[in-house]
Amino acid sequence: MKSLTSGVLALGMVLAVTPAFAQAAGEKGPERIVWAAHKTPDSPYTKPNRPIWHIADILKAHQGKQSWDQQILLTRDYDGHYVSMAPGEKTKCMFYADDRVFGWIYSGQVKITIDGQQPFTANKGYLFDVAPRLSYCLENTGTEPVVFYRSTPAGQVPSYPESETPTPIKGWVYGKAKITSTGGYEEPNQPFLDFNAYATGGGKSRDFAFDGHTAAHIIRSGNVKALPPSTSWGHFHENMVEAWVVIEGQLDVLITGEPLVTGELGDVIQANNERWHRATCHPNIGSCTRLAMTPRNKEGQVHYFQTGQPPGN
């Protein structure tokens, strides 16, 4: 009995001097003032990136063509394209090893087939999310071209099921290999969302494509009567680009070093890393929604705000 008491006492002493490693992380901790770095001059926009791509200009550039592919965004994390497929056109089935493919349908309709899921037809306004390691194929089953925005992981080439013939890519060679990993869907991820119906039904802001690398959020905002003052800059991120696809209404974005830009439905707006940015609905047009794209949000993400502005501005 004496030895048991001694053992309990010794254990208590060990626990008393053992550091507490458990510590909850999050974005709603106590407010504190820090020194944060900005590049000087501002982080540049290199091709194909620019503060705003207008869908009207993209469509005009491909006028008379039904099938085309234009890269409009390339960051460390995402490779964003606007794509048009002619009626009857099909893609090969492919997948990405450890990252998602996601996008939004601007016009037309496309049949999307994903491993393990029932094929579905995505019409205008649909969002789609292909989980890693699940092959997917696209087919235009409509009578007009389908135009959509699609994001794939930057710097990564796709893999193909054995039944497909890989498309040659300069600097790469394909060979057969075995894998055992597969993909799947966990909340909040889902293969598709009819955004127009979601919005009509009063749907709120939510995560859509979301994991340890990818973060694509539906951000819905209500009508505003006037823009914030020009002294309100919003926030910025370190070492992280933020971009938006306007999927409802009109969006006004103020970005460091740029004049105020107004995005219409389908436009893509990009704020480079370390640049202040403030996104609001264009005044007096009703609600607006953007598909906001940043990386690494699941583990938390620092938003740097101005010291002289109210919280969140």
Regions found by a protein language model. Give the residues of each.
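Bacterial N-terminal signal peptides
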Residues: 8-16
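A short, N-terminal "cap"/entry segment at the start of jelly-roll beta-barrel domains
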Residues: 23-79, 92-93, 158-221, 226, ...
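Short histidine-centered beta-strand/loop micro-motifs
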Residues: 70-72, 91-97, 114, 139-140, ...
